[in-house]
């Protein structure tokens, strides 16, 4: 049974597989550090306050920072957490537990640099980053898991929730669901384990790192075939020539085209701008929250029409 669950975690990236078929509304939430956690929470809560029933999503896909928000939304706790984030934004030190330690050791910096510089998602590239993540002198895995558990406080796995991660040794994409036999906190911690910053997390017999080490920051193929999808990506409005962190130039646009070609009407949204160097800075959470709510006000009518 354990071997079956271990093997079932691996799911190749494929839009043709139409993983989202049978679902009416898919919410796809990408990575982007603490900053994007706050932005997404404020944006989605802002949409809800303006009449868009975001929590009606029957498929919620979360990657990296998005796995935390996906857990919150699928558990029906968005409104409550939005109030907490707004409060915590005024006390940045309380958010520090999720931002990693300060100065990096050389072994950590090596993994961070490899991930940041990667412009493709070839298996050898991903495995090279994974091996560096395993070798990095990071805090023990349970430290992040406990911090995530304290923030989420979710014991029962929400049926709609799917989180992503990457096997550090094989480079395979891993998808954790209600059938995987893994806690929400462990799954979200694995999805958020940035190479060199946090230790890879145990998912059954695998050691898993950030779901973004895969050529995609959203894994929107998991929504392919759904009735409609709302995709939140940190780089939604960034130049298509941008590359790094295993994504190639134009990959975001190709992914959106493939999702739509699968028969899923998709809307892509994200911040107008962001500071890549400040994504893990707790002091920037308040500004991210304000930006997310402001964008929700701009987008509410269009998203409501799309969401149905």
Which residues make up each language-model segment?
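Gly/Ala-rich beta-loop-alpha elbow adjacent to hydrolase catalytic centers
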Residues: 62, 66
């Amino acid at each position: 049974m354990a071997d079956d669950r271990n093997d079932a975690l691996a799911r190749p990236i494929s839009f043709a597989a139409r993983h989202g078929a049978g679902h009416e509304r898919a919410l796809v939430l990408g990575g982007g550090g603490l900053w994007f956690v706050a932005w997404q929470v404020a944006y989605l809560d802002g949409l809800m306050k303006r009449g868009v029933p975001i929590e009606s999503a029957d498929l919620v896909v979360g990657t990296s920072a998005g796995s935390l928000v996906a857990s919150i939304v699928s558990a029906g706790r968005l409104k409550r957490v939005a109030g907490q984030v707004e409060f915590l934004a005024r006390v940045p030190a309380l958010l520090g537990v999720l931002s990693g330690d300060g100065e990096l050791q050389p072994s950590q910096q090596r993994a961070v640099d490899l991930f940041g510089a990667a412009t493709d998602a070839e298996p050898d590239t991903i495995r090279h980053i994974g091996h560096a993540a395993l070798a990095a002198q990071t805090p023990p895995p349970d430290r992040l898991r406990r911090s995530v558990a304290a923030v989420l406080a979710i014991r029962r796995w929400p049926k709609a929730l799917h989180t992503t991660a990457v096997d550090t040794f094989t480079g395979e994409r891993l998808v954790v669901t209600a059938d995987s036999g893994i806690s929400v906190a462990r799954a979200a911690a694995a999805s958020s384990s940035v190479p060199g910053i946090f230790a890879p997390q145990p998912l059954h017999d695998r050691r898993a790192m950030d779901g973004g080490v895969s050529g995609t920051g959203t894994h929107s193929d998991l929504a392919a075939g759904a009735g409609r999808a709302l995709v939140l990506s940190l780089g939604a409005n960034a130049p298509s020539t941008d590359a790094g962190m295993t994504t190639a130039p134009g990959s975001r646009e190709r992914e959106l085209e493939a999702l739509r070609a699968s028969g899923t009407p998709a809307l892509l949204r994200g911040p107008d701008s962001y500071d890549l160097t400040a994504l893990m800075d707790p002091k920037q959470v308040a500004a991210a929250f304000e930006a997310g709510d402001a964008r929700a006000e701009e987008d509410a009518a269009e998203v409501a029409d799309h969401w149905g």
